[in-house]
């Protein structure tokens, strides 16, 4: 019997981008690169070298020496230059060759690519633009004053390589209300997106599921208010306000990534926690460690999905799925020439998802799960 194919919706996987996103990309905490050694970073389909000069200023260059292709990240830092391990050619942070030790003269015009850098909140950023334009002041990553205040912990930082996925997979999460229930085991009772200019924001109120314990971002009877904003294509600041009964905890989560290739990226996340009054530093550190562990479990829940899903350019949506297509239009501004950015990519857009029906259905599921758990526990006790 022939299979009925009329009305079947096919998945359009589309094509991967032909360039990397324009914008600031976070490489990690400054302290990770400030040990006097050159560090390699695989990013944007190439390799970069990061090194600190004698004043502690961080510099980023193309990693491969323009002389004979040696890997500068395998070399050494000598004064204000990074020295190639192959023939000791010295390169300054401005990209100019400063010295060829064995030569009568150093080529005056010898240059490699030097990358724009910035430091915000103790984190190092590198600028990428397919057209080669310098960064504009209005898209600079905002400062994170809490990190400087002395009243918050230092960054608890994690990173991992995600292979087989494009960066857009993580961006889609900004509009995905329902995955908080199914992947992160919470009940999102309020969910709103606002996109404007180079910023995309998510506002969330989430309560824990009583039928789930110790699963990452599930917090039992805890309540969470969250404001999360992407500043450009790859760096999110997430202000988290957690309530556990009478106890309140303030924290900031950084959710960021940078592309390695078009189908792989490095996912990074970091947490700082406001030091609760009356707690000593050791206890505060334990609190920060515990919170970071929970956040890490949450990211790994997402990673498990990304590892096995397909890219889909034509997702089939229901009302509660929110502004997926609008989010992708916003994201597209970073993958076209500046002259080709259209108003629908940057004009202000707001959407609040009505979670009422979803929460009603989910609460029924939660109660059924609790009933089944109670019956299973009773049966186990009587056996």
Swiss-Prot record:
Keywords: 2Fe-2S, Cholesterol metabolism, Iron, Iron-sulfur, Lipid degradation, Lipid metabolism, Metal-binding, Oxidoreductase, Steroid metabolism, Sterol metabolism. It catalyses: androsta-1,4-diene-3,17-dione + 2 reduced [2Fe-2S]-[ferredoxin] + O2 + 2 H(+) = 9alpha-hydroxyandrosta-1,4-diene-3,17-dione + 2 oxidized [2Fe-2S]-[ferredoxin] + H2O. Binds 1 [2Fe-2S] cluster per subunit. Binds 1 Fe cation. Fe cation binds at residues 173, 179, 184, 302. It comes from the Bacteria. One of its GO terms (biological process) is cholesterol metabolic process. The keyword RNA-binding does not apply. Residues 24-126 form the Rieske domain. Transmembrane segments: none annotated. It is an enzyme of class 1 (oxidoreductase). Its cofactor is [2Fe-2S] cluster; Fe cation. Gene3D superfamilies: Naphthalene 1,2-dioxygenase Alpha Subunit, Chain A, domain 1, Rieske [2Fe-2S] iron-sulphur domain. GO terms for molecular function: 2 iron, 2 sulfur cluster binding; 3-ketosteroid 9-alpha-monooxygenase activity; metal ion binding; steroid 9-alpha-monooxygenase activity. [2Fe-2S] cluster binds at residues 65, 67, 84, 87. Induction: Induced by KstR. Disruption phenotype: Cells lacking this gene form 4-androstene-3,17-dione and 1,4-androstadiene-3,17-dione from sitosterol. Its EC number is 1.14.15.30. Involved in the degradation of cholesterol. Catalyzes the introduction of a 9a-hydroxyl moiety into 1,4-androstadiene-3,17-dione (ADD) to yield the 9alpha-hydroxy-1,4-androstadiene-3,17-dione (9OHADD) intermediate which spontaneously form 3-hydroxy-9,10-seconandrost-1,3,5(10)-triene-9,17-dione (HSA) via the meta-cleavage of ring B with concomitant aromatization of ring A. This is 3-ketosteroid-9-alpha-monooxygenase, oxygenase component. The lineage of its organism: Bacteria, Bacillati, Actinomycetota, Actinomycetes, Mycobacteriales. The gene is kshA.
